[in-house]
Amino acid sequence: MLLGLTGTRFGVHFVTKAQRAKVKEAMTFTGIADKAHYRLSELSGGLRQRVAIAQALVCDPKLLMLDEPLANLDLASQRAVVHVLARLNKELGMTIQVVAHDLNMLLPILTGAVYLLDGHPHYAAMNDVLDSKLLTHLYGTKVQVVTTPQGDMFVTPTPDEADDIVPDTHDTSEVAQFHHHEYHERKGRAQ
């Protein structure tokens, strides 16, 4: 946890009582306080991810930026990390930016998305992004947005028929329809 306070793990560091309390608070918040005496190498990927979040928390950030925070984690670990992120936002009012290719576990806590379309960034609310046609274009493969009877949503690839495989969905005419939110404007008028 010293890395979060000092920026380095090596050398002699004098840690104040207040800093120790902040570390304990961050570890408790992320659910890793009981692992304080373990070496990082002894922890699972999910616990390591929560250690990294706790390290960031000791500095009282207003913004937390994460790159693929759920990558290579089992479902239980993904859920635990998402739970911590949701609490950070709801209880501490922290803004969280996440780079992720697989959105499914994050969908319940996402409010918007910045996505790259033909090399240009665009922002949209999640309701606008969760569109099969747009996501098919962004992922470069056919996908569908599925809503469960409980109201949960997830994005999944559409099984392709052998002669229905789309080799490249990024042709110029298709890209043009999504630029400048033209797609979202047309979608709004059609409803």
Predicted segments, located by residue:
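Conserved ABC ATPase "signature" region
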Residues: 2, 16-35, 41
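Conserved ABC ATPase signature
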Residues: 39-43, 47
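ABC ATPase nucleotide-binding domains
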Residues: 138-191
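H-loop (His-switch) and adjacent beta-strand-loop-beta switch element
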Residues: 112-126
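H-loop/switch region of ABC-family ATPase nucleotide-binding domains
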Residues: 100-101
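Conserved catalytic motifs of ABC-family nucleotide-binding domains
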Residues: 60
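Catalytic Walker B motif of ABC-type/P-loop ATPase nucleotide-binding domains
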Residues: 64-68
